[in-house]
Amino acid sequence: MNAAIEHVQAVAFDLDGTLCDSVPDLAAAAEAMLEQLGMKPLPAKVVESYVGDGIGKLVHRVLTNDRDREADSELWEKGFVSYMKYYRDHLSVFTRPYPETEAGLALLKSLGIPLVIITNKNEILAAELLKQLGLADYFSLILGGDSLPEKKPSPLPLRHAAEVLGIDAANMLMVGDSRNDIIAAKAAGCLSVGVTFGYGDMTLLSQDDTTRPDRIIGALPEIYENLQPQKNKDEE
């Protein structure tokens, strides 16, 4: 990301694969669920490929070992209860922020603009995970996949966040690692920023107009560096 960004009044972030690497704990919960159900475990890389649409969808995918199929409703219910019970108690055993996450958030906070979380993870789990990682105080709003009637790739969470903050969605950045983040941002009229260190393949996503982010970064501090010219102009 090498050009100044102007008129930004808020920055929204995805959580898993953007601020932190949570796959080890998500995969451990999947393994515990499968073991309890008498099923074979899946490699962590497979679980990683299923992340991004909320835990309900993740459980379907893990149980069927397929991105698009849904498990039998009775099996899914047992699996979901098992998964949630384990995951709630093991949110941050292995989950850690990416190396420059906290530095990037601190720099952005110094600009005086609000930071928000827009994730498809359940809101209560997202809030607790941020607390356990020591990141909760950076954010003025947390929206989870169950906070509103629709979640990403719907633009509703982004538009709702902008409304709560009292700004135009066009003045908010959406930072994420997946197609859901980019599609939601485009539909809401936000500038989309893709990260190269998450679970999504930015090279692949950039090949399609519908999933090509407006900017791509390799570390969160790059956002601050490109907002600095805006701050300097505002202070003149």
UniProtKB/Swiss-Prot annotation:
Residues that bind Mg(2+): D14, D16, D177
Single GO term (MF): metal ion binding
Keywords tagged on the record: Carbohydrate metabolism, Hydrolase, Magnesium, Metal-binding
Entry superkingdom: Bacteria
InterPro entries found in the cross-reference section: HAD-like_hydrolase_sf, HAD-like_sf, HAD-SF_hydro_IA, HAD_sf, PGP-like_dom2, PGPase_prok
Active site: D14
Pfam short name (any one): Hydrolase
GO cellular component: cytosol
GO biological process, one term: carbohydrate metabolic process
Catalytic activity: 2-phosphoglycolate + H2O = glycolate + phosphate
Cofactor(s) required for function per UniProt: Mg(2+)
Assigned EC number: 3.1.3.18
Pathway field: Organic acid metabolism; glycolate biosynthesis; glycolate from 2-phosphoglycolate: step 1/1
Family: Belongs to the HAD-like hydrolase superfamily. CbbY/CbbZ/Gph/YieH family.
Cross-referenced PANTHER family: PHOSPHOGLYCOLATE PHOSPHATASE
Functional description taken from the UniProt entry: Specifically catalyzes the dephosphorylation of 2-phosphoglycolate. Is involved in the dissimilation of the intracellular 2-phosphoglycolate formed during the DNA repair of 3'-phosphoglycolate ends, a major class of DNA lesions induced by oxidative stress.
The protein's name in its UniProt record: Phosphoglycolate phosphatase
Organism whose genome encodes this protein: Neisseria gonorrhoeae (strain ATCC 700825 / FA 1090)
